[in-house]
Curated annotation (Swiss-Prot):
Modification comment: Upon interferon induction, ISGylated via host HERC5; this results in the impairment of NS1 interaction with RNA targets due to its inability to form homodimers and to interact with host EIF2AK2/PKR.
SUPFAM superfamilies xrefs: Ns1 effector domain-like, S15/NS1 RNA-binding domain
Residues spanned by motif Nuclear localization signal: 34-38
Lineage per the UniProt record: Viruses, Riboviria, Orthornavirae, Negarnaviricota, Polyploviricotina
Family: Belongs to the influenza A viruses NS1 family.
Role noted for this protein: Inhibits post-transcriptional processing of cellular pre-mRNA, by binding and inhibiting two cellular proteins that are required for the 3'-end processing of cellular pre-mRNAs: the 30 kDa cleavage and polyadenylation specificity factor/CPSF4 and the poly(A)-binding protein 2/PABPN1. In turn, unprocessed 3' end pre-mRNAs accumulate in the host nucleus and are no longer exported to the cytoplasm. Cellular protein synthesis is thereby shut off very early after virus infection.
Protein name as annotated: Non-structural protein 1
Originating species: Influenza A virus (strain A/Grey teal/Australia/2/1979 H4N4)
Length: 230
């Protein structure tokens, strides 16, 4: 096993522990708490994949961080912070909408890279809006936290979420996953719209209905892909 992989996991475990202590003092805002919860799932998946105990890794990560801080000057810290571009966290959904449980009558699921696409194929003839919470850097989607499909009545009928055991995805990965979700939902004559935030940072183009322009041929192909591969 690569030593950098192990040490990276150890540092991530310790930093998560620090953030958890911060949250326990009721100091974290909603985006902070959301990332904390999802990073916990990711660390559990990575720990299982690597065969490493999280508690032991956390202690080792503390030693690594302490050693770095001992060598770090205030001036170097200022330069590092100034040179790192800041990302923004954008929210279409409330914390309640993100954490709400939902159920599928005819479940369909597809894994595309490090993203999991889920949808209820029993939904027909509905107006559906895609909403997402994600981070943006350089005016492009950086990391998808969660995307969900809502009917006008507020029911959740689809979802795209990162797999905890496979961290890392690009904006193109997200765009392709959204295309698969839209294709599957439109197969049952649903009308799908994309939120303005997603249009701006993930699609960069849309038609008058507020959804990405997908040719009918491509739409049918993606819908068949969902049915054949799930």
């Amino acid at each position: 096993m690569d030593s950098n992989t192990v040490s990276s996991f150890q540092v991530d475990c310790f930093l998560w522990h620090v953030r958890k202590r911060f949250a326990d003092q009721e100091l974290g805002d909603a985006p902070f708490l959301d990332r904390l919860r999802r990073d916990q799932k990711s660390l559990r998946g990575r720990g299982s994949t690597l065969g490493l105990d999280i508690e032991t890794a956390t202690r080792a990560g503390k030693q690594i961080v302490e050693r770095i801080l001992e060598e770090e000057s205030d001036e170097a810290l200022k330069m590092t912070i100034a040179s790192v571009p800041a990302s923004r966290y954008l929210t279409d959904m409330t914390l309640e909408e993100m954490s709400r449980d939902w159920f599928m009558l005819m479940p369909k699921q597809k894994v595309a890279g490090s993203l999991c696409i889920r949808m209820d194929q029993a939904i027909m003839d509905k107006n559906i809006t895609l909403k997402a919470n994600f981070s943006v850097i350089f005016d492009r989607l950086e990391t998808l936290i969660l995307l969900r499909a809502f009917t006008d009545e507020g029911a959740i009928v689809g979802e795209i979420s990162p797999l905890p055991s496979l961290p890392g995805h690009t904006d193109e990965d997200v765009k392709n996953a959204i295309g698969v979700l839209i294709g599957g939902l439109e197969w049952n004559d649903n009308t799908v719209r994309v939120s303005e935030t997603l249009q701006r940072f993930a699609w960069r183009s849309s038609n008058e209905d507020g959804r990405p322009p997908l040719p009918p041929k491509q739409k049918r192909k993606m819908a068949r892909t969902v049915e054949s591969e799930v």
